């Protein structure tokens, strides 16, 4: 499980950790963690699930989704880095937009479509019935935030090196993302 996002000590540790990364010189950081970067990710762990303590459950229930609890935490981090973009995933249990909590102005939502059936045949996000809930979530997030990145999975996870003829779908997805004034991340 992810850490408890309602733990009052967690933002302090996350802010210090991120600040140390940002303060490092270029020679001290790996290529993937360029300290001059404008975007920094503060996101949930991959595939673990959210904290289910009483405080987190209450927060999740209030916002109708664990994304609200995540955003409350991320907003605390973003407040300390006003000149950086703090990106966070809308992914698995945080994909549904919260009812009340809104991202800070420097928080970027990175929508991920991994839950939808994309194996074998690739279906376009804009028109496929399989992606109806993703489209709804995308619209809902668009109502409450300034910037959304879309992480479109353009790979077949069952066999990473096999040919995956998805160029036409990629184009459809880029066009639909551009049409909705979002930024595509592939």
Indicate residue ranges for each PLM-predicted region.
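Aromatic-lined carbohydrate-binding surfaces of glycoside hydrolases
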Residues: 1-174, 183
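Conserved small/polar residues in nucleotide/adenosyl-binding loops
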Residues: 180-186
């Amino acid at each position: 499980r992810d850490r408890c996002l309602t733990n009052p000590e967690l933002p302090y540790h996350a802010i210090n950790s991120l600040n140390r990364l940002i303060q490092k010189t270029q020679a001290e950081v790996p290529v993937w963690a360029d300290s001059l970067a404008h975007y920094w990710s503060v996101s949930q762990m991959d595939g673990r699930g959210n904290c289910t303590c009483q405080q987190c459950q209450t927060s999740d229930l209030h916002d109708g989704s664990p994304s609200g609890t995540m955003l409350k935490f991320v907003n605390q981090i973003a407040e300390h880095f006003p000149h950086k973009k703090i990106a966070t995933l809308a992914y698995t249990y945080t994909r549904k937009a919260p009812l009340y909590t809104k991202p800070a102005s420097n928080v970027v939502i990175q929508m991920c479509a991994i839950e939808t059936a994309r194996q074998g045949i690739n279906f376009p996000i804009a028109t496929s019935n399989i992606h109806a809930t993703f489209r709804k979530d995308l619209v809902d997030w668009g109502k409450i935030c300034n910037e959304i990145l879309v992480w479109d999975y353009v790979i077949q996870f069952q066999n990473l090196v096999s040919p995956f003829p998805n160029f036409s779908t990629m184009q459809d997805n880029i066009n639909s993302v551009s049409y909705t004034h979002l930024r595509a991340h592939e």
